[in-house]
Amino acid sequence: MANMRKSHPLLKIINHSFIDLPTPSSISSWWNFGSLLGICLLIQISTGLFLSMHYTSDTMTAFSSVTHICRDVNYGWLIRYLHANGASMFFICLFLHVGRGLYYGSYAFMETWNVGVILMFTVMATAFMGYVLPWGQMSFWGATVITNLLSAIPYIGPTIVEWIWGGFSVDKATLTRFFAFHFILPFIIAALAMVHLLFLHETGSXNPSGLDSNADKIPFHPYYTIKDILGALIMISVLILLVLFSPDLLGDPDNYTPANPLNTPPHIKPEWYFLFAYAILRSIPNKLGGVVALVLSILILALLPFLHTSKQRSLIFRPITQVLYWILVADLLVLTWIGGQPVEHPFITIGQLASILYFSIILIFMPLSGLIENKIMKWY
C-alpha cells in the first residue's frame, strides 16, 4: 500500500499534497485556517445541494419554498441554518486566514496570494447572491442597492445594471440567474482553491519566524493532520452550537418578511461579514467614489507584495508594524460596527475617519514603519 501511495498517478498527487508534504515544524494554529476553509466549502456545497432540491427560484414561490424547507422537509431547518451559519463560519475563517497572511508576510508568495485575492472576491460574490435567494425584504433591497452601484460606471453603467437585472428592476429574471450563479460558483471556488494549493506547494509554507525552514521540516501526516482534525472539531462544534441554540443571531429579522418592492426597510444593510466594506462605501458622499473605495478595500490586498519595504518577512520581530497591524484590526472592527448603524451623526464621521485610517495604514504607515525598522536594525 505504501508503494502504491507513492507510485499510483492519482494517489501520488494526494500523497505529495497531504501525506508526505514537507512542512515547517514551527507553524502554529494560525496555519489551520486553510484546511478549515476547505471543510467550510464542503459543508456549504453539501448543504446547498440538498437545499437546491427543494428551493424554487421564482419570485412568487421562493420565500414560501424556504418556509417549506424549514417546516416540512425532514431536518430541512437544520440544513438551512447549517448553510446560513456555515457562511458566517466561512468568512470568520477567511478573515483570520487573510489576517495571518498579512501578519506573517505570506503575501511574499505572490502567485498564491493573488489567487487568494481572486478567491476572496469570488466567495464574496457567491455569498451576496446566496443572500438574495430567500427573497425576504433584506434580500430584495440588498440586491437592488448593490447591483445599482454598477450604474456609477461612466457611460455603460445603467446598461450593465439592466443587463444584470434582466429587466428594469430586480425581478424574476434576476432571482433565477442569481440562483444559477450561486449554484455554479462554489465549484469554481473549489477549482481555484486547488490552484491556490498548487502554487503554495511550489514554494512550500512560510513559518512564524519568516526565516528559511528547509533545514527543519516534518511530514504533514500524522503531525498536521491531527492538528487540522482538532481545529475542524472545534469549528464544527461552534457551528453546531450556533445552529442549535441561536440560528438567527447573525441574520436580519427583516428577511422574515417577504420581499415587497413598495415598502423599503428603514435600514438596508448586508450580512455582518460585508459591513466593513459597506461602511467604506457609505463614507464617501460620491457614488462612483464609493464604488471605487468598496472595490479597493479588498483589491488593496493585491498591492501588499509591492508595499513591503522591510528586510524581514514576518511581523514577529517588528514592534512598530505590529502596533499598526493591531490598530488595523481594531479599525476593521469599528468599520464593521459602523456598517450596521444608521446614516446619521456621529456614525458618518466615525465611518469616514475609520475608512481614511484603513487605507492610510496599508498604503502609508506600514511601508514607512518597515523603512524605519530597517534603519533601527542598522544601528544595532
UniProtKB/Swiss-Prot annotation:
- GO:BP terms for this protein? mitochondrial electron transport, ubiquinol to cytochrome c
Q: Tell me the residue numbers annotated for binding heme b b566.
A: H97, H196
The family assignment reads: Belongs to the cytochrome b family.
Which cofactor names does the annotation list?
Answer: heme b
List membrane-spanning regions: 33-53, 77-98, 113-133, 178-198, 226-246, 288-308, 320-340, 347-367
Q: Which InterPro entries match?
A: Cyt_b/b6_C, Cyt_b/b6_C_sf, Cyt_b/b6_N, Cytb/b6-like_sf, Cytochrome_b, Cytochrome_b_C_euk/bac, Cytochrome_b_N_euk/bac, Di-haem_cyt_TM
Matches recorded under PROSITE patterns: CYTB_CTER (PS51003), CYTB_NTER (PS51002)
Q: What is this protein called?
A: Cytochrome b
Per the record, its GO cellular-component terms are: mitochondrial inner membrane; respiratory chain complex III
Q: Where in the cell is it found?
A: Mitochondrion inner membrane
What does the cofactor section's free text say about binding? Binds 2 heme b groups non-covalently.
GO molecular function (one) = ubiquinol-cytochrome-c reductase activity
Membrane topology is: Multi-pass membrane protein
Instruction: Report the superkingdom from the record.
Output: Eukaryota
Concerning PANTHER family, the annotation shows:
CYTOCHROME B
| Residues that coordinate or bind heme b b562 | H83, H182
Additional comment: Heme 1 (or BL or b562) is low-potential and absorbs at about 562 nm, and heme 2 (or BH or b566) is high-potential and absorbs at about 566 nm.
Q: How does it assemble?
A: The cytochrome bc1 complex contains 11 subunits: 3 respiratory subunits (MT-CYB, CYC1 and UQCRFS1), 2 core proteins (UQCRC1 and UQCRC2) and 6 low-molecular weight proteins (UQCRH/QCR6, UQCRB/QCR7, UQCRQ/QCR8, UQCR10/QCR9, UQCR11/QCR10 and a cleavage product of UQCRFS1). This cytochrome bc1 complex then forms a dimer.
- UniProt: a ubiquinone binding residues: H201
Q: What does this protein do?
A: Component of the ubiquinol-cytochrome c reductase complex (complex III or cytochrome b-c1 complex) that is part of the mitochondrial respiratory chain. The b-c1 complex mediates electron transfer from ubiquinol to cytochrome c. Contributes to the generation of a proton gradient across the mitochondrial membrane that is then used for ATP synthesis.
> Where mainly found?
mitochondrion
Q: Which UniProt keywords apply?
A: Electron transport, Heme, Iron, Membrane, Metal-binding, Mitochondrion, Mitochondrion inner membrane, Respiratory chain, Transmembrane, Transmembrane helix, Transport, Ubiquinone
